Swiss-Prot record:
Effect seen on changing M214R: In allele Bel01; loss of manganese binding and reduced catalytic activity
Localization of this protein: Golgi apparatus, Golgi stack membrane; Secreted
Known role: This protein is the basis of the ABO blood group system. The histo-blood group ABO involves three carbohydrate antigens: A, B, and H. A, B, and AB individuals express a glycosyltransferase activity that converts the H antigen to the A antigen (by addition of UDP-GalNAc) or to the B antigen (by addition of UDP-Gal), whereas O individuals lack such activity.
Lumenal compartment spans: 54-354
Tissue expr: Expressed at high levels in testis. Also expressed in pancreas, uterus and lung and salivary gland.
Reported effect, R198W: In allele Aw07
Protein name, UniProt field: Histo-blood group ABO system transferase
Length: 354
């Protein structure tokens, strides 16, 4: 290019061509820059083949015009919480009690006529936890909003009858059981991905995917809704990344080196928009199938693959351990102002084994 410009500069008769040539050079540079920096190159699908984190669009709540509301003014110089991290390095909120105004959020999502799907797997002996799960969900989960429960089970007749509130419904989705509890856990990703295509995309706006051997003890509402969220594991929220139980074997698709990692997310509470949940569950299932073909199983099964996915595709919100806690094992530390969704005491070996 420099030689071309020097040649043209040495020919006085070509002065009239200079503006046209400069224009063409600028056009080429602009088109090249667009190709490199185009937002399409930052989409999740391309990033799985590339090297940088996925960038997602915001929740679009700014499109809603709120009515007049009276509430305490947020104060720029007074942080809502001084004892915990409330935002990630990629500017995703970390949701703790005291960091949000639920009245504002309820109004925003109500005006959007949002429907939330809640998926839960009640396979084999785990069907025994379903009644308490559903009864407490009716008291605390997305109260005042439209909810669709999706119960995946191998025993449709054993699903209890629970009185549901207005705008709330339940669908029973019959699925097969697997011999090992690990396979039941891992196959959840495949089943959720399949039903995203078959039903969820046309029936709900957001999906929340949780474990069944739990109970809701306090408010769990629209403050969690976002394109993609994960939940901090109650056993690791104060730990360094070196202590996380990531999959450390390079042969696995879930492998994370010891010098990488933001947080350790648990597999029992994740979600987001249906489109994002479909991407997540499909990617995790495909990764597990590659591992299976290579004769390796990640240390914590689907949870290991979930952590790998959320490392490469940063969540747009992170839920604090308030949203899944085991009080029997961990007590109630002062940093948790509320225990919202807690483990039911049980003998793990008894419920996991036939």
């Amino acid at each position: 290019m420099a030689e071309v410009l020097r040649t043209l500069a040495g020919k006085p008769k070509c002065h009239a061509l200079r503006p046209m040539i400069l224009f063409l050079i600028m056009l080429v540079l602009v088109l090249f820059g667009y190709g490199v920096l185009s937002p399409r190159s930052l989409m999740p699908g391309s990033l799985e083949r590339g090297f940088c984190m996925a960038v997602r669009e915001p929740d679009h709540l700014q499109r809603v015009s709120l009515p007049r509301m009276v509430y305490p003014q947020p104060k720029v110089l007074t942080p809502c919480r001084k004892d915990v991290l409330v935002v990630t390095p990629w500017l995703a909120p970390i949701v703790w009690e005291g960091t949000f105004n639920i009245d504002i959020l309820n109004e925003q999502f109500r005006l959007q006529n949002t429907t939330i799907g809640l998926t839960v797997f009640a396979i084999k002996k785990y069907v025994a936890f379903l009644k308490l799960f559903l009864e407490t969900a009716e008291k605390h989960f997305m109260v005042g909003h439209r909810v669709h429960y999706y119960v995946f089970t191998d025993q449709p007749a054993a699903v209890p009858r629970v009185t549901l509130g207005t705008g709330r419904q339940l669908s029973v989705l019959e699925v097969r059981a697997y011999k090992r509890w690990q396979d039941v856990s891992m196959r959840r990703m495949e089943m959720i991905s399949d039903f995203c295509e078959r039903r969820f995309l046309s029936e709900v706006d957001y999906l929340v995917c949780v474990d069944v051997d739990m109970e809701f003890r306090d408010h769990v509402g629209v403050e969690i809704l976002t394109p993609l969220f994960g939940t901090l594991h109650p056993g690791f929220y104060g730990s360094s990344r070196e202590a996380f139980t990531y999959e450390r074997r390079p042969q696995s698709q879930a492998y994370i080196p010891k010098d990488e990692g933001d947080f350790y997310y648990l597999g029992g509470f994740f979600g987001g928009s249906v489109q994002e949940v479909q991407r997540l569950t499909r990617a995790c299932h495909q990764a597990m199938m590659v591992d299976q073909a290579n004769g390796i199983e990640a240390v914590w099964h689907d949870e290991s693959h979930l952590n790998k996915y959320l490392l490469r595709h940063k969540p747009t919100k992170v839920l604090s351990p308030e949203y899944l806690w085991d009080q029997q094992l961990l007590g109630w530390p002062a940093v948790l102002r509320k225990l919202r969704f807690t483990a039911v005491p049980k003998n793990h070996q008894a419920v996991r084994n036939p």
